[in-house]
A protein has these predicted regions:
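C-terminal substrate-recognition "lid" of short-chain dehydrogenase/reductases
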Residues: 136, 140, 148, 228-262
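Conserved glycine-rich cofactor-binding loop
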Residues: 21, 28-29
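Short C-terminal tail/terminal secondary-structure segment
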Residues: 2-13, 161, 239-240, 251-264
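Short, small/polar-rich loop/turn modules that mediate ligand/substrate recognition or access, typified
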Residues: 188, 193, 250-252
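Residue(s) in the substrate-gating loop at a strand-loop-helix junction
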Residues: 156
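Substrate-binding pocket helix/loop in short-chain dehydrogenase/reductase
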Residues: 112-113, 117-125, 151, 220
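Active-site helix of classical SDR
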Residues: 136, 172, 180
Length: 264
């Protein structure tokens, strides 16, 4: 096969998302908000989804003002199939067909396994694993019919390692990683890529308990080869890459943004 080097695009243009429409669950705070902002900065119109309408609308207004893109807020419980169907209809009215789906809504309930309730388990699994499945099931086939799509699931370093006191969370994130791989295989031939971002420790609301405990915070730092927690902006580049044409040959992969933790 002869290589046509003259056909290569400007590499920076590959990262532009002009004309694309993205939906980010849990986009009102934490890593989801950072990802939503990055996609908008790259030219995408964005739908911010959370359970609380006031939260997602406030975030949407802030991001629209700072990025000069169309950003809307839509309330939905993405762990409920009826809400996901309603969400799909609503975002199509507001923005059009979704090209980029980011499943970043997350929940963590910490505690020893024998101390956790069944409802604790169900809540974490529903938010972290069931919701990406439901959203993928609705939006993925629509992307396939149009021949282009990007799905990014938020995994974790706990997709591949374990820590005490995190049975529901680690189980859900391990599931997310294999869900990502299965969907990638099912839709690879139809122009839709499915990948996971697996972050290490970041300063988000989910980690307030650790951030407020100096000993626990430093214990995590000691496990990270770069010697610090992640900063929120450091997730943005990973998301933009996987959402763009630059990653058209990347699917079924997990991108670890963890300061080297899982390299050990």
């Amino acid at each position: 096969m002869e290589t046509d080097y003259g056909s290569r695009k400007n590499v920076l243009a590959l990262f532009r998302l002009d004309g694309r429409r993205a939906l980010v669950t849990g986009g009102n705070r934490g890593l989801g908000r950072v990802i939503a902002e990055a996609l908008a900065q790259a030219g995408a119109d964005v739908a911010i989804v959370s359970r609380t309408l006031s939260d997602c609308r406030a975030t949407a207004e802030e991001l629209a003002a700072s990025t000069n893109r169309r950003v809307v807020g839509i309330a939905a419980d993405v762990s409920q199939s009826s809400d996901v169907e309603r969400l799909a209809a609503a975002v199509e009215i507001e923005l059009g067909q979704v090209d980029i789906l980011v499943n970043s809504a997350g929940l963590n309930v910490r505690g020893a396994a024998e101390e956790l309730s069944e409802s604790d388990w169900d809540a974490v699994i529903s938010t972290n694993l069931k919701a990406p499945f439901l959203c993928g099931r609705v939006f993925g086939p629509r992307m396939c019919r149009r021949g282009w799509g990007r799905i990014i699931n938020l995994g974790s370093i706990l997709s591949v390692i374990a820590l005490p006191g995190r049975a529901p969370y680690a189980s859900s994130k391990a599931g997310v990683l294999n869900l990502t791989r299965v969907l990638a295989l099912e839709w690879a031939a139809k122009g839709v890529t499915v990948n996971a971002i697996c972050p290490g420790p970041f300063a988000t609301d989910m980690n307030k308990q650790l951030l407020n405990d100096p000993a626990a915070y430093q214990a995590f730092v000691a496990k990270i080869p770069v010697g610090r927690w992640g900063e929120l902006h450091e997730i943005a580049g990973a998301a933009l890459f996987l959402a763009s044409d630059a990653a058209s040959y990347v699917t079924g992969s997990a991108l670890f943004v963890d300061g080297g933790w899982t390299a050990q």
